[in-house]
Structures are given as structure tokens and as C-alpha cells.
Amino acid sequence: MAAAPRAGRRRGQPLLALLLLLLAPLPPGAPPGADAYFPEERWSPESPLQAPRVLIALLARNAAHALPTTLGALERLRHPRERTALWVATDHNMDNTSTVLREWLVAVKSLYHSVEWRPAEEPRSYPDEEGPKHWSDSRYEHVMKLRQAALKSARDMWADYILFVDADNLILNPDTLSLLIAENKTVVAPMLDSRAAYSNFWCGMTSQGYYKRTPAYIPIRKRDRRGCFAVPMVHSTFLIDLRKAASRNLAFYPPHPDYTWSFDDIIVFAFSCKQAEVQMYVCNKEEYGFLPVPLRAHSTLQDEAESFMHVQLEVMVKHPPAEPSRFISAPTKTPDKMGFDEVFMINLRRRQDRRERMLRALQAQEIECRLVEAVDGKAMNTSQVEALGIQMLPGYRDPYHGRPLTKGELGCFLSHYNIWKEVVDRGLQKSLVFEDDLRFEIFFKRRLMNLMRDVEREGLDWDLIYVGRKRMQVEHPEKAVPRVRNLVEADYSYWTLAYVISLQGARKLLAAEPLSKMLPVDEFLPVMFDKHPVSEYKAHFSLRNLHAFSVEPLLIYPTHYTGDDGYVSDTETSVVWNNEHVKTDWDRAKSQKMREQQALSREAKNSDVLQSPLDSAARDEL
């Protein structure tokens, strides 16, 4: 009889375990309804909302040069393509814009929700325009009508948003669309960068609707202030939230009945926003992309293509290159040497990133170069230095830190020295030398070729022409060269970023036997054209007759200056030339040599130099 209670307890244990299991809390992440005992009580969770419907509107005219890269950037936007519609219009083309767009649309049509294609092959120009870059009234009106048609299409298809993108605007941040949507603004633009102060927004507007300079602009443009800012104007690339009730009152055409300002598409739309009480915003929280500085009305299609190519070069200075669309055939490039006998590009083997960027930059400009492996001074030991017969110039000290020559500076000198030897050995009449840490100015190739033609036409006796440098004599202007545009007689200068050297000039530099009395190469050159301020250095070189000139304005600048993110020096952050134990890394943060060119007084500016038409091809920065 005593065993019966124990058997009952054993029978009750499974029931107790089942009850505890039913009452136990659900594990983290279990779906709602999973705790239901009966099947009919179980239910599935609600699915997330679908991505918003977006229409991307692209208007293109004479944009064949830009479209492969612009469209490649649009392809990489992180937004579901099945929730994205394309609205594309092109007309009045003098190039093959229609062909490029058609090739792309045929390839991507099945990837997107829908495609609306509005091509017009004729006419090729407007009757009242002076050239392809001139904005006449009829062109403004036509563009306004096209934007209005795109807006109507977006409304008709019940799109949540419409994103307007100019054909030469590069949206490189793939999250741009989602970031703008998250701002929850009726009209919002991503701030696009350019080579100058220009961007796709205004901070001020006059009572007549024109641009007004304000103190607020530059801090936003430079991202000293970050955020989303209320502004009177955004243009080129911007997003409209069509879910907002006020968006129904926005229009590009016809202009508002009360509109009396200039007949300009961006001003007309800004006025429409103002009348609808819709505030425009520009966001600079992230880096979103780039756009070119507008060209003047007299500019050509070649100017425009080279201007956009320069945007791509600027992208590569601090970002990965902007890759073109894989759906568009790449045009064939035919690099040349720009009329030089040789184009040298110096690069340290361990600086692969610089090499790749420079080779891509030169290829983009169709410049053929010979890659020269730089002498790595840091890898040289004292025995190797002595075997070359190298001795430092007696008494030399760095002008900023009082240190002797570094191994990095030694390697830099030998790299240039070896090129001078090759110039002489091969009998090269004129050569162009690049270092690998430089950025190109707009129209670089054409401007330098024009300069060299002027030099040859005038029969100028020259040995070396700086293409990029840091001007050290800033007290008075340099002497302009008569009848040669963009050229001055060089005074004391730093840097050997890029220069042109003649056979005669290379012979003069080698004849000075500089290895036996070495100093940094950018100190040696001013000694040789007798402009160095330290007479003790010059005394060691009896023949100082190098004929040196400089391009003005410069066509080459450094990619980075002291203090910039990414600044690296292979010459100043090194060790002393004859002692591996004496380091000079203190210069990394304090280097004065690689600081940006100091501002010149009005009296010291080279204002007498003859200017080229290409110097003023771009409009005012703002």
C-alpha cells in the first residue's frame, strides 16, 4: 500500500513538466504566436513595409562624355531596382548622347520597375543660343517643361519620391537616396563637392532672385558645420517627397503667376517652393558626390568633356575612382606624349596606391608615360651611399628644423638625377617629369601643350620649366616672359612635383657634379639658376646658368599638405643620410616645407603674365 503514492507522483511528473513548459517564457527572437497551444491560435508576424517607390529623372544634353560614369553611379544606389522607375530625356545633341542612353536603357530596362524614354534627335541646337554651353531663354523654357513632365509622370504613377539628377553629377555614396529619404523633408539635396567653392545650393538670394554671398555658405561648403540646413536654393541633384501635401503645389512650368524674376529654371522652381511655403534643405552630413564647376557660355564641348574628366581626377585624390557603367561600351583612348620626347613618372615601389592613382589619372587624360622606379633612400645603407661617392653639401641644414639631409631626400635626389642621366644618354630634347603625389589643374594637357607651342614659336632659350612648385620668394612679382602666355622667370622655389627639362638643362645639372655636394633636389635647382638666398650654398657651384621658368598659374599642385588627412612624406619623415639611428619623424606634424603656398600680397602677384583663354573658361566659383 505504501508504493501507491509514489506511483501517483511518477504519473504526475510528465503533466507537471508539460505545464511548466507551457508557462515558461519564450526564448528571445521567437515569433509572436509561437506560444499558442492550439494550431488555430498561432499567427505569423506582420511583414516590413516595402521600400518607397522612387522615380529617377535624368535630363541629358551633349553628355556622352559623362554618362558612362554618371549612370554607373546611379546603378550602385542601394535602393531596390524593382521599386525604382527611370525617366530619361535627351535632345538638341551634337554628340552621341542618345546612342549612349539607348544602349544603357536597353540593357537595364528589365532590372527597373519601368522606363520612360524621351529622345529627340532634331533639332541639334536652339535658334537663340550662341553655343552648346549658352543658356538661352528657349533652352531654359524647354528644360522647365521637361522637369515638369517628369514630375507629372512621378505623380501619375503614385511615386513616393522623385530624384532629379543632372547628367554630369556623380552620386558616389550608394546610400545617398536612403539618407535623403530619412531626412523627411519635402525638398532636400545632398551637398555635392567640386574643385572650387561651387556646389548645388545657395545660402542667400537677393530680392530679385539672384545669388547673394553670405557668411553661412563657406562653413557649410567646407563641412565646418554639418547637418541639414534650410537654404533658399538647391539645384542639379535633389529629392522631392511627393507624399507631402505641400508637394502638390510645386511646379517647374509654367512659372508662378506672380513670378517676375530672371527666366532661369532653378530660380523659377525656388520661387515655386517659396510660394508653396516649402522650405528647401541641403545636407552635408556625409560625402555624397561631385559635380563640375559650370563653364562660361563661350565654352566648347571639348571644354565640357575635359571639365568632367577633371571631376573624375579630383575624385581619385581622396576616394576610389568613379567606375563607369558595365552596360555601356567604353570609348577607345589613344594616349600620347604631348609632344615631349618622353614623359617620366617617378614612383616608389612600396607606394602602390599612388602608382595606381597616377596611372589612372594619366590614362584618363590620354597621357603616355614611362614609369620610373624611385630610389628608396630609406632602404639604402651607409655603404651603398659611400659607394656612389655621395657627400652632403658642407654646412647644409634644413631651413626649418636645422637637420641635415635625410635618406628620403637622398633617394628623391637620386631619382631625379637618374632621369637627367637618361635624358642625356638618350639625347631627349625635351621631357616632362612627374612625381606621384600631385593633382592636376583643369585643362592640364591642353594648357601645357599650348604653352610649349608658344615657347617654341618664340625661340625661348630654356632649360627647365616648373609646372608645379611652391613659390618661396613672395616679396615682389616674378618677371613675365614677353609674348609667351602663362610663363614667368622662376625665382626661389620649392618642390619638384612636375617640370619640363631640356637636354641642355639636364647636361648643366649633371655637369655640376651634385652627388659630391648634395642637398635636397628642390634646393639644388634654385642654386643652379642662381636664385637661392643662401650664398654659402651657391659658392660650391661655380657655374649657375640654368635658365629656369615657371608656368603661371600653376598646372600642378600637391594632393596633400602638412596636416591634411592622408599626408605622408617619404623625404622628411626618414633618417639622417649617414646615420640610420637619427630619425627625423618630428617633421610629420610640423613640416613647413609641405605647407600650402602662403598668400601673396597684391604687389607680389604675377599680374603682368599674359593669360590664356583657358584660364578663364570656368564661371565664378559661386
Swiss-Prot record:
Question: What EC number(s) would the UniProt record show?
Answer: 2.4.1.50
**Superkingdom field:** Eukaryota
Q: What is the effect of changing D461A?
A: Loss of galactosyltransferase activity
Catalyzed reactions = (5R)-5-hydroxy-L-lysyl-[collagen] + UDP-alpha-D-galactose = (5R)-5-O-(beta-D-galactosyl)-5-hydroxy-L-lysyl-[collagen] + UDP + H(+)
- Segments for region (Disordered): 588-622
GO molecular function of the protein, one example?
procollagen galactosyltransferase activity
EC supergroup of this enzyme = transferase
Q: Which PROSITE patterns match?
A: ER_TARGET
Compartment list = Endoplasmic reticulum lumen
Per the UniProt entry, the effect of D336S is: Small decrease of galactosyltransferase activity
Instruction: Name the glycosylated positions.
Output: N96, N184, N381
Keywords, A to Z, come to: Disease variant, Endoplasmic reticulum, Glycoprotein, Glycosyltransferase, Signal, Transferase
Q: Where is the composition biased (Basic and acidic residues)?
A: 588-606
Q: In which tissues is it expressed?
A: Ubiquitous with higher levels in placenta, heart, lung and spleen.
Q: Name one GO biological process term.
A: positive regulation of collagen fibril organization
Recorded GO CC terms: endoplasmic reticulum lumen; membrane
Q: In the record, which residues are listed under signal peptide?
A: 1-29
Describe the processing and modification events after translation.
Answer: N-glycosylated.
Q: Motif Endoplasmic reticulum retention motif: residue span?
A: 619-622
> Which InterPro entries does this chain map to?
Collagen_mod_GT25, Glyco_trans_25, Nucleotide-diphossugar_trans
Q: What, per the annotation, is the impact of changing P292N?
A: Small decrease of galactosyltransferase activity
Name the linked condition.
Brain small vessel disease 3: An autosomal recessive form of brain small vessel disease, a cerebrovascular disorder with variable manifestations reflecting the location and severity of the vascular defect. BSVD3 patients may have disease onset in utero or early infancy with subsequent global developmental delay, spasticity, and porencephaly on brain imaging. Other patients may have normal or mildly delayed development with sudden onset of intracranial hemorrhage causing acute neurologic deterioration.
This chain's function reads: Beta-galactosyltransferase that transfers beta-galactose to hydroxylysine residues of type I collagen. By acting on collagen glycosylation, facilitates the formation of collagen triple helix. Also involved in the biosynthesis of collagen type IV.
Q: Which PANTHER family match?
A: PROCOLLAGEN GALACTOSYLTRANSFERASE 1, PROCOLLAGEN-LYSINE,2-OXOGLUTARATE 5-DIOXYGENASE/GLYCOSYLTRANSFERASE 25 FAMILY MEMBER
Family indicated by similarity? Belongs to the glycosyltransferase 25 family.
Q: By what name is this protein known?
A: Procollagen galactosyltransferase 1
- Organism of provenance: Homo sapiens
Q: Which gene encodes it?
A: COLGALT1
